[in-house]
Amino acid sequence: MAAKNLPKVFFDVAVNGKPSGRLTFKLFSDTVPKTAENFRALCTGEKGTGVSGKPLHYKGSHFHRIIPGFMAQGGDFTMGNGRGGESIYGHKFNDENFTLKHTGKGVLSMANAGPNTNGSQFFITFDKTPWLDGNHTVFGQLVEGNQVLEILEQHGTQSGMPTAKVEIVDCGEIKN
C-alpha cells in the first residue's frame, strides 16, 4: 500500500516547561504534496533560515490559540502570536486543494487568513469541523498521542488564549 510510504513527523510537547508527551502525525503527501512537504521540512528545520531571518523550524514555537471542542493552533515561529509565520517557499503559498475533509479528532490542517495565504501556521482538530472544508487544506492526521492532544485541549479557553504555555520542545521526521 502507498500509505506505508507517507511521511511521519512528531512534536514533543511541554506545558509550562513540563514534558507532556509526543504527537505523531502521518502526512498526506500523496494528495497534497506541496503542503505536506512544507510541514515536514518545518518539523525537521532542514531548510535553514527564512526570509524573515528566523529559522524555518517549529522547535521552540508554541500553540498560541486553543479552543476546547474545536482546535489547537500553532506554527507562528516568527512572531509567536498568530500574526506571523512563513512557508519554506517564501512568505505564503497557494491552497493546493480541498480534497481531504475535517472529519474528526486529530485532523491536521493549514491555518490561513483567506484564500491562498498558507504559511507555517496549522491547527489540529479536537472534533469534526465540516464548516472548514473548502477553506483550509487538510494535510495530515494524528496517528499517536491522543492523550497529549487531550492535554492541549484542557489548556484551552473559549477566547482561544491558552491557560498555560504549550510549547513544541522538539520535532522532526520519523523515518520508516
Curated annotation (Swiss-Prot):
A molecular function (GO) held by this record is: cyclosporin A binding
Catalytic activity of the protein:
[protein]-peptidylproline (omega=180) = [protein]-peptidylproline (omega=0)
Give the PPIase cyclophilin-type domain ranges.
10-173
Which Gene Ontology terms of cellular component type are present? cytoplasm
The UniProt entry's GO biological process terms, in alphabetical order, are: protein folding
Question: Which keywords belong to this entry?
Answer: Isomerase, Rotamase
Which CDD domains did the record assign? cyclophilin_ABH_like (cd01926)
Q: Give the enzyme's EC designation.
A: 5.2.1.8
InterPro entries on file: Cyclophilin-like_dom_sf, Cyclophilin-type_PPIase, Cyclophilin-type_PPIase_CS, Cyclophilin-type_PPIase_dom
Q: Does the keyword Transcription apply?
A: no
Domain of life where this protein originates: Eukaryota
SUPFAM superfamilies xref list: Cyclophilin-like
Give a short account of what the protein does. PPIases accelerate the folding of proteins. It catalyzes the cis-trans isomerization of proline imidic peptide bonds in oligopeptides.
Q: Which family does it belong to?
A: Belongs to the cyclophilin-type PPIase family.
Q: What PANTHER family would the database entry show?
A: PEPTIDYL-PROLYL CIS-TRANS ISOMERASE, PEPTIDYL-PROLYL CIS-TRANS ISOMERASE D-RELATED
What's the protein called, per UniProt?
Peptidyl-prolyl cis-trans isomerase cyp5
- Species source reads Rhizopus delemar (strain RA 99-880 / ATCC MYA-4621 / FGSC 9543 / NRRL 43880)
